[in-house]
């Protein structure tokens, strides 16, 4: 379904540890927005929803809702750090178009 690079796993683990709270997992969602129509949303959740698909990535639980699941199939998530900033990036084989900033896509 979705692959996290070592850099992404390390970043997610750091973020979970910094909350000081029990975290059920990282919610990855596709929602409307951005200049190409769809964008990724990430949020640490204390509990999952009934219809979530739970994906284990080396001990990190990903919470994926049923509407987002087909759009995330085959996605690779990375965490990059540069002089311009840091953040998560996504390579999505399902995307037919993406905007210049890399923050949104179309299927």
Swiss-Prot record:
GO terms for molecular function: 2 iron, 2 sulfur cluster binding; 4 iron, 4 sulfur cluster binding; iron ion binding. It comes from the Bacteria. Coiled coil: none annotated. One of its GO terms (biological process) is iron-sulfur cluster assembly. InterPro entries: FeS_biogenesis (IPR000361), FeS_cluster_insertion (IPR016092), FeS_cluster_insertion_CS (IPR017870), HesB-like_dom_sf (IPR035903). Belongs to the HesB/IscA family. PANTHER family: IRON-SULFUR CLUSTER ASSEMBLY 2 HOMOLOG, MITOCHONDRIAL. This is Uncharacterized protein in nifU 5'region. It comes from Azotobacter vinelandii.
């Amino acid at each position: 379904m979705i692959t996290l690079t070592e850099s992404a796993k390390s970043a997610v683990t750091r973020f979970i540890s910094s909350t000081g709270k029990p975290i059920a997992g990282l919610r990855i969602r596709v929602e409307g927005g951005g200049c190409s129509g769809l964008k990724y949303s990430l949020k640490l959740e204390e509990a999952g929803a009934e219809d979530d698909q739970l994906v284990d990535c080396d001990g990190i639980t990903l919470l994926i809702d049923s509407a987002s699941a087909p759009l995330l199939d085959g996605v690779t998530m990375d965490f990059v750090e540069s002089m311009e900033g840091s953040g998560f990036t996504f390579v999505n084989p399902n995307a037919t178009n993406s905007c210049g900033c890399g923050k949104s896509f179309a299927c």
